[in-house]
Amino acid sequence: MGSVNYQTIRLSKGKHRSPEDGACVMELASMLAGEQFSDHPVSVCPVIAALLRSYNDSIDDRRRQDLYGYASKVVGSRAGLTVERARAERLTAWTHERRPPRRTRWLMPGRLRAFAPDPPVHILAARAIQALPAHDDRTHAEVLGLVEELLDLGRRSGPPSVARTARTDRLHALT
């Protein structure tokens, strides 16, 4: 059997030590970007990466294979703090559209909440995936639509990044 590469790898759950062990969608993105094999590729927006890692690990194998194209789409999506913050806010709003936040007497008063730190992006992503009532074709399309929305937030913010415009032909082979 030949060596595993971005064209022959099969997406699977979890974190992997090497491509020979398999890859999640973000590990594939790191391969496509020419980065060190990792589920936290430098060239990918942390908000989008967290969402795709959580989603990759929560869906069945058939739907997971639909994420191949997104591995290439997200390479070069890392942007400035303003875009990252806008993406995190959209992810939070999307989550609340599916499952409004619970109100309890234990919540901080509004004036104190303004000083509370925002949750890390991996928590926001996990909450978004947990807000899905089921993993079916409808919710699958919704999550993929959200990824497109998050990518668009970066595209509208200004000219494309050097990383995005310098993609190799192998990235386009997947889309």
Spans of features found by a protein language model:
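Structured binding/interaction patches within domain cores
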Residues: 37-175
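Leu/Val/Ala/Ile-rich N-terminal alpha-helices, chiefly Sec-type signal peptides and the beginnings
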Residues: 6-50, 58
